Protein backbone atom coordinates (compact mmCIF):
# COMPACT_ATOMS: atom_id res chain seq x y z
CA UNK A 1 0.00 0.00 0.00
CA UNK A 2 1.12 3.54 -0.67
CA UNK A 3 0.19 4.68 2.84
CA UNK A 4 3.18 5.90 4.81
CA UNK A 5 5.44 6.38 1.77
CA UNK A 6 5.23 10.18 1.82
CA UNK A 7 6.36 12.28 4.75
CA UNK A 8 3.87 13.29 7.44
CA UNK A 9 4.65 16.50 9.28
CA UNK A 10 3.26 17.36 12.71
CA UNK A 11 3.23 21.00 13.79
CA UNK A 12 2.51 22.21 17.32
CA UNK A 13 0.98 25.44 15.91
CA UNK A 14 2.39 27.61 18.69
CA UNK A 15 3.82 31.13 18.60
CA UNK A 16 2.80 34.28 16.77
CA UNK A 17 0.95 34.14 13.45
CA UNK A 18 4.10 34.78 11.37
CA UNK A 19 5.95 31.91 13.05
CA UNK A 20 3.02 29.55 12.59
CA UNK A 21 2.63 30.50 8.91
CA UNK A 22 6.36 30.04 8.28
CA UNK A 23 6.31 26.61 9.97
CA UNK A 24 3.23 25.64 7.94
CA UNK A 25 4.85 26.61 4.61
CA UNK A 26 8.06 24.75 5.50
CA UNK A 27 5.94 21.70 6.40
CA UNK A 28 4.12 21.85 3.04
CA UNK A 29 7.43 22.03 1.17
CA UNK A 30 8.82 19.06 3.11
CA UNK A 31 5.78 16.92 2.26
CA UNK A 32 5.84 17.84 -1.44
CA UNK A 33 9.60 17.16 -1.58
CA UNK A 34 9.02 13.69 -0.13
CA UNK A 35 7.58 12.56 -3.51
CA UNK A 36 11.24 12.28 -4.57
CA UNK A 37 12.28 10.22 -1.55
CA UNK A 38 13.54 6.65 -1.89
CA UNK A 39 10.42 4.92 -0.49
CA UNK A 40 7.91 6.42 -2.96
CA UNK A 41 10.28 5.95 -5.90
CA UNK A 42 10.97 2.29 -5.04
CA UNK A 43 7.23 1.68 -4.58
CA UNK A 44 6.51 3.24 -8.00
CA UNK A 45 9.28 1.14 -9.61
CA UNK A 46 7.90 -2.06 -8.04
CA UNK A 47 4.39 -1.29 -9.34
CA UNK A 48 5.33 -0.03 -12.81
CA UNK A 49 4.38 3.57 -12.01
CA UNK A 50 7.73 5.30 -12.45
CA UNK A 51 6.93 6.84 -15.85
CA UNK A 52 3.65 8.40 -14.69
CA UNK A 53 3.28 12.03 -13.67
CA UNK A 54 3.36 12.09 -9.87
CA UNK A 55 0.51 14.19 -8.53
CA UNK A 56 -0.10 14.93 -4.91
CA UNK A 57 -2.91 16.41 -2.91
CA UNK A 58 -2.23 17.60 0.61
CA UNK A 59 -4.41 16.91 3.63
CA UNK A 60 -4.11 19.28 6.57
CA UNK A 61 -5.93 18.11 9.64
CA UNK A 62 -6.08 18.81 13.33
CA UNK A 63 -4.62 16.23 15.69
CA UNK A 64 -7.31 15.33 18.18
CA UNK A 65 -6.02 14.59 21.65
CA UNK A 66 -5.25 15.93 25.09
CA UNK A 67 -2.44 17.76 26.79
CA UNK A 68 -0.52 16.00 29.56
CA UNK A 69 2.20 18.23 30.97
CA UNK A 70 4.34 19.31 28.00
CA UNK A 71 2.95 16.51 25.80
CA UNK A 72 -0.04 16.43 23.46
CA UNK A 73 -1.35 13.16 22.06
CA UNK A 74 -4.44 11.18 21.12
CA UNK A 75 -5.20 8.32 23.48
CA UNK A 76 -5.17 5.81 20.62
CA UNK A 77 -4.46 5.87 16.89
CA UNK A 78 -4.40 3.23 14.24
CA UNK A 79 -4.36 2.08 10.67
CA UNK A 80 -7.08 -0.17 9.30
CA UNK A 81 -6.61 -2.60 6.43
CA UNK A 82 -9.55 -4.00 4.47
CA UNK A 83 -7.76 -7.35 4.18
CA UNK A 84 -5.82 -9.14 6.90
CA UNK A 85 -2.73 -10.74 5.35
CA UNK A 86 -1.41 -11.53 8.83
CA UNK A 87 -3.91 -14.20 9.92
CA UNK A 88 -2.09 -16.15 12.65
CA UNK A 89 -5.12 -18.28 13.55
CA UNK A 90 -7.43 -20.26 11.22
CA UNK A 91 -10.49 -18.65 12.90
CA UNK A 92 -9.48 -15.23 11.54
CA UNK A 93 -11.36 -14.17 8.42
CA UNK A 94 -8.85 -12.40 6.18
CA UNK A 95 -11.54 -10.53 4.24
CA UNK A 96 -12.78 -8.75 7.39
CA UNK A 97 -9.58 -6.76 7.84
CA UNK A 98 -7.08 -5.79 10.49
CA UNK A 99 -6.35 -2.79 12.71
CA UNK A 100 -2.86 -1.86 13.90
CA UNK A 101 -3.50 0.15 17.06
CA UNK A 102 -1.06 2.24 19.10
CA UNK A 103 -1.11 4.53 22.10
CA UNK A 104 -0.25 8.11 21.09
CA UNK A 105 0.25 9.45 17.57
CA UNK A 106 -0.43 6.96 14.79
CA UNK A 107 3.07 7.14 13.32
CA UNK A 108 3.97 3.84 14.98
CA UNK A 109 0.87 2.18 13.55
CA UNK A 110 1.91 3.11 10.00
CA UNK A 111 5.58 2.12 10.33
CA UNK A 112 6.77 -0.43 12.86
CA UNK A 113 9.79 0.93 14.68
CA UNK A 114 12.66 -1.18 16.02
CA UNK A 115 11.65 -3.49 18.84
CA UNK A 116 8.36 -1.68 19.50
CA UNK A 117 5.09 -3.21 18.35
CA UNK A 118 1.53 -2.06 17.63
CA UNK A 119 -1.44 -4.09 18.87
CA UNK A 120 -2.70 -6.24 15.98
CA UNK A 121 -6.49 -6.60 16.03
CA UNK A 122 -8.23 -8.91 13.54
CA UNK A 123 -11.70 -7.46 12.98
CA UNK A 124 -13.31 -10.90 12.71
CA UNK A 125 -12.01 -11.89 16.18
CA UNK A 126 -10.83 -8.76 18.06
CA UNK A 127 -10.03 -10.68 21.26
CA UNK A 128 -7.48 -12.95 19.53
CA UNK A 129 -3.86 -11.92 19.71
CA UNK A 130 -0.78 -13.52 18.17
CA UNK A 131 1.01 -13.66 21.54
CA UNK A 132 -0.07 -16.26 24.09
CA UNK A 133 2.22 -16.21 27.13
CA UNK A 134 2.89 -13.27 29.46
CA UNK A 135 6.56 -13.02 28.34
CA UNK A 136 5.45 -12.95 24.67
CA UNK A 137 2.82 -10.29 25.35
CA UNK A 138 5.37 -8.22 27.26
CA UNK A 139 7.99 -8.58 24.50
CA UNK A 140 5.61 -7.71 21.65
CA UNK A 141 3.92 -4.74 23.33
CA UNK A 142 4.32 -1.05 22.71
CA UNK A 143 6.88 0.51 25.06
CA UNK A 144 7.41 3.90 23.46
CA UNK A 145 5.03 6.34 21.85
CA UNK A 146 5.16 9.35 19.61
CA UNK A 147 3.82 12.61 21.04
CA UNK A 148 3.91 16.32 20.30
CA UNK A 149 6.22 18.07 22.75
CA UNK A 150 4.60 21.50 23.11
CA UNK A 151 7.53 22.95 25.04
CA UNK A 152 10.08 22.04 22.34
CA UNK A 153 7.64 22.44 19.43
CA UNK A 154 8.48 19.03 17.93
CA UNK A 155 7.21 15.50 17.59
CA UNK A 156 9.26 13.15 19.73
CA UNK A 157 9.33 9.62 21.03
CA UNK A 158 8.93 9.09 24.77
CA UNK A 159 9.05 6.02 26.94
CA UNK A 160 5.67 4.90 28.26
CA UNK A 161 6.88 5.27 31.86
CA UNK A 162 7.95 8.89 31.19
CA UNK A 163 4.48 9.73 29.97
CA UNK A 164 2.64 7.81 32.69
CA UNK A 165 4.47 9.94 35.28
CA UNK A 166 2.71 13.09 33.98
CA UNK A 167 -0.49 11.48 32.74
CA UNK A 168 -3.32 11.45 35.23
CA UNK A 169 -5.95 9.90 33.02
CA UNK A 170 -8.44 7.21 34.06
CA UNK A 171 -8.40 5.73 30.54
CA UNK A 172 -4.76 4.73 31.03
CA UNK A 173 -6.38 1.71 32.67
CA UNK A 174 -7.22 0.42 29.17
CA UNK A 175 -3.69 0.84 27.77
CA UNK A 176 -1.60 -0.97 30.38
CA UNK A 177 -1.21 -4.33 32.04
CA UNK A 178 0.43 -4.94 35.39
CA UNK A 179 2.65 -7.97 35.89
CA UNK A 180 2.33 -9.87 39.15
CA UNK A 181 3.65 -13.35 39.84
CA UNK A 182 4.37 -13.99 36.15
CA UNK A 183 0.86 -13.06 35.02
CA UNK A 184 -0.42 -9.97 33.22
CA UNK A 185 -3.65 -8.32 34.26
CA UNK A 186 -5.27 -4.91 33.97
CA UNK A 187 -4.76 -2.61 36.95
CA UNK A 188 -7.15 -3.35 39.81
CA UNK A 189 -9.00 -0.06 39.33
CA UNK A 190 -8.85 3.02 37.11
CA UNK A 191 -7.18 5.28 39.65
CA UNK A 192 -4.47 2.81 40.71
CA UNK A 193 -1.05 4.45 40.97
CA UNK A 194 1.14 2.64 38.45
CA UNK A 195 4.45 4.09 39.60
CA UNK A 196 6.82 1.31 40.55
CA UNK A 197 4.71 -1.37 38.85
CA UNK A 198 6.31 -3.68 36.31
Where are these regions (language model features)?
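Conserved mixed alpha/beta core segments that line enzyme active sites in large multi-domain catalysts
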Residues: 1-198
